[in-house]
Amino acid sequence: MESNKPAIVRIIKQNKPNEKVPIWLMRQAGRSLPEYRKAVEKTSNFMEICYSIDLVVELTLQPIKRFDMDAAIIFSDILIIADVLGCDVNFVRGVGPIIKPVKSSEELKNSQEFETKTFPILNAIRKVRSQLSEEKSLIGFAGGPWTVASYIIEGGSSKTFSKVLHFCSLELEEVIKKITEATIIYLIKQIEFGADVIQLFDSNAGILQGELFERYVIKPTKEIVSAIKNKFPDFPIIGFPRSAGNLYKDYYEKTGVSAVSIDYNVPIEWAKANLKIPLQGNLNPSLLAYNKAEAIEEAKRIIDCFRGLPFIFNLGHGVLPDTPVENIAALVDLVRNY
């Protein structure tokens, strides 16, 4: 019965509001928590953490234990797909991901070995789901193919994305095709191992406009959504095409996602008027980190705007590492009681 499902699953599947607005935060498990810093202090690199079953379970559950969030999101990274496809992914403290740049789709390995490589993550999903109470959702995720492609072609993050934008379009389509196929396999496995909801993080979607947005963001996302829903009809899938602006409307209408997470640059009144779909968002993480009083006022404004609509409270991007835990606690308390 749907009434027994977690609030976030119900909101998305029924397209109806919940009596209480549920809350979880992107990057809720991470460097803002002292228990996270203690748990990872003896690890040598970030990818080691991502492939450690016990650490992933512990880190995923930390914000549930501390803040009683309505959802846990599996502790992982969007570049797991790149790593499994044979890209040499390393994380450098203070810099971010460093990857040997891919110059051809032929450099990407076949995705047949996927389950073996990702088994620690999938096993962690199963363990978290068994330890999570029934009323809480477990969110699995992957990066949007365009975003993953832009990282592996650039060799990491970029301010200009000049390499990927100059990349041969036929070759780029082949890279995105391989990433899309691998993402489908990975997300279906996450669902089979216990994820209740999937989120697609297309963090670099805002770089593209018009026909390029259609080709590299909408098309692969639609393929992923169709493949998942072909196997799991009505499965809740949240899309997050960050910084897509008014293309959020095209995105949700054409991809078939079940809900959309909006970034903090999207005016909430515009979202309410134009995005007729369950919404998630969109408090600015900088406000939460550096101005608690202003963050609380803005959170009230967001809740008031979406009152009576299918809505999940979140940030417009991930929690910043130096966000005080008391600010997060105050936000959760506000959303619970407002």
Curated annotation (Swiss-Prot):
<comment type="function">
    <text>Catalyzes the decarboxylation of four acetate groups of uroporphyrinogen-III to yield coproporphyrinogen-III.</text>
</comment>
<keyword id="KW-0627">Porphyrin biosynthesis</keyword>
<feature type="binding site">
    <location>
        <position position="77"/>
    </location>
    <ligand>
        <name>substrate</name>
    </ligand>
</feature>
<protein>
    <recommendedName>
        <fullName>Uroporphyrinogen decarboxylase</fullName>
        <ecNumber>4.1.1.37</ecNumber>
    </recommendedName>
</protein>
<dbReference type="GO" id="GO:0005829">
    <property type="term" value="C:cytosol"/>
</dbReference>
<comment type="similarity">
    <text>Belongs to the uroporphyrinogen decarboxylase family.</text>
</comment>
<dbReference type="GO" id="GO:0006782">
    <property type="term" value="P:protoporphyrinogen IX biosynthetic process"/>
</dbReference>
<keyword id="KW-0210">Decarboxylase</keyword>
<dbReference type="GO" id="GO:0004853">
    <property type="term" value="F:uroporphyrinogen decarboxylase activity"/>
</dbReference>
<dbReference type="InterPro" id="IPR038071">
    <property type="entry name" value="UROD/MetE-like_sf"/>
</dbReference>
<comment type="pathway">
    <text>Porphyrin-containing compound metabolism; protoporphyrin-IX biosynthesis; coproporphyrinogen-III from 5-aminolevulinate: step 4/4.</text>
</comment>
<dbReference type="InterPro" id="IPR006361">
    <property type="entry name" value="Uroporphyrinogen_deCO2ase_HemE"/>
</dbReference>
<feature type="site" description="Transition state stabilizer">
    <location>
        <position position="77"/>
    </location>
</feature>
<comment type="subunit">
    <text>Homodimer.</text>
</comment>
<feature type="binding site">
    <location>
        <position position="203"/>
    </location>
    <ligand>
        <name>substrate</name>
    </ligand>
</feature>
<keyword id="KW-0963">Cytoplasm</keyword>
<dbReference type="InterPro" id="IPR000257">
    <property type="entry name" value="Uroporphyrinogen_deCOase"/>
</dbReference>
<feature type="binding site">
    <location>
        <position position="317"/>
    </location>
    <ligand>
        <name>substrate</name>
    </ligand>
</feature>
<dbReference type="Pfam" id="PF01208">
    <property type="entry name" value="URO-D"/>
</dbReference>
<keyword id="KW-0456">Lyase</keyword>
<feature type="binding site">
    <location>
        <begin position="27"/>
        <end position="31"/>
    </location>
    <ligand>
        <name>substrate</name>
    </ligand>
</feature>
<feature type="binding site">
    <location>
        <position position="151"/>
    </location>
    <ligand>
        <name>substrate</name>
    </ligand>
</feature>
